[in-house]
Amino acid sequence: MYAMNPLYDMCAVEVGQHYYWLIAGYQVHAQVLITSWFVIGFLLIGCFVASRNLQEIPEGGQNFLEYVLEFIRDLAKTQIGHESRKWVPYLGTLFLFIFVSNWSGALVPWRLIELPNGELGAPTADINTTVALALMTSTAYFYAGLTKKGFGYFSKYLKPTPILLPINILEDFTKPLSLSFRLFGNVLADELVVAVLISLVPLVVPIPMMLLGLFAGAIQSLIFATLAGAYIGEALEGH
C-alpha cells in the first residue's frame, strides 16, 4: 500500500529518531545543526542582498528590510522602554530566526533529503533549539538586571514580602521552561498534523492546515520575541 502512494516517503513521520555527528568526542544533533545553518544562511544572504546597494529612497528588498527593522524597534520600545535601542539586535535576531525556522518547516521539503537516521525538519520543532533560545533569553534578562542594578537586582525576590522568596525564584526558572515548551509544542504539533494529513488524503486537502501553520508560526515568533522583551524590560525596571 505504501509503495502505491508516492507521497508516503515524503510525509512519513519519524518521532524520536536522531542523526548524530561526533565532534571532539561529543555527540551533536546533526539534524538541528543542518537546518539551523540553512536558516542562518538564508537570513545572512537575504540581508546582504537587500542592503548591498542602499538608496536614500528605499525600494524593493531594502524597503522590506527597513520595514522589518522598524517593526522590531517598535516591539522593543513597547516592551523595554527608553533603553530598548541596545536590545533591538537581540530581539530582532530572535524574531527572524524563529520566524524563518517555523516557516521552513512548511515551505521547505525537508523530507526529500534522506539521512542515515531520522529526518530533517524545522529547527524549532526540536526541543534542543527551543531550550537554547529560552536559556539565551534567561541569560539576557539576568544580564540586563545585573548590569543596571548590580547584586541589588536579587532584592526583587524579597518583594513584596520575603515569604514569597521561593515562589519568586521558581518564577524565574519557569520562564525558560514555558518559552521553550510553548514554541516546541506548537511547531512540532503543526508538522505532525500536516504530515499525517498528507499521508491520508490528497495533497490539496491539507493546504488550509498548512496555511494555518504558517500563520501560527508567525504568531509564535512574535510571542517569543514579545515575551523576551517583556522579561528584559521587567529586569531593567524591577517590577
Swiss-Prot record:
An example GO CC term for this entry is:
plasma membrane
**Record flagged with keyword Transmembrane helix:** yes
Q: Which InterPro entries is this protein grouped with? A: ATP_syn_F0_a_bact/chloroplast (IPR045082), ATP_synth_F0_asu (IPR000568), ATP_synth_F0_asu_AS (IPR023011), F0_ATP_A_sf (IPR035908)
Q: Which UniProt keywords apply?
A: ATP synthesis, CF(0), Chloroplast, Hydrogen ion transport, Ion transport, Membrane, Plastid, Thylakoid, Transmembrane, Transmembrane helix, Transport
Write out the GO MF terms.
proton-transporting ATP synthase activity, rotational mechanism
Q: Where in the cell is it found?
A: Plastid, Chloroplast thylakoid membrane
Q: How does it sit in the membrane?
A: Multi-pass membrane protein
Q: Which residue spans traverse the membrane?
A: 30-50, 88-108, 127-147, 192-212, 213-233
| Location, primary (coarse class) | plastid
Q: What does this protein do?
A: Key component of the proton channel; it plays a direct role in the translocation of protons across the membrane.
PANTHER family assigned to the protein according to its UniProt record, in alphabetical order: ATP SYNTHASE SUBUNIT A, CHLOROPLASTIC
Oligomeric form and interacting partners: F-type ATPases have 2 components, CF(1) - the catalytic core - and CF(0) - the membrane proton channel. CF(1) has five subunits: alpha(3), beta(3), gamma(1), delta(1), epsilon(1). CF(0) has four main subunits: a, b, b' and c.
Give the family, as the similarity comment puts it: Belongs to the ATPase A chain family.
Q: What is this protein called?
A: ATP synthase subunit a, chloroplastic
- State the species of origin: Nephroselmis olivacea
Top-level taxonomy: Eukaryota, Viridiplantae, Chlorophyta, Nephroselmidophyceae, Nephroselmidales
**Gene name linked to the record:** atpI
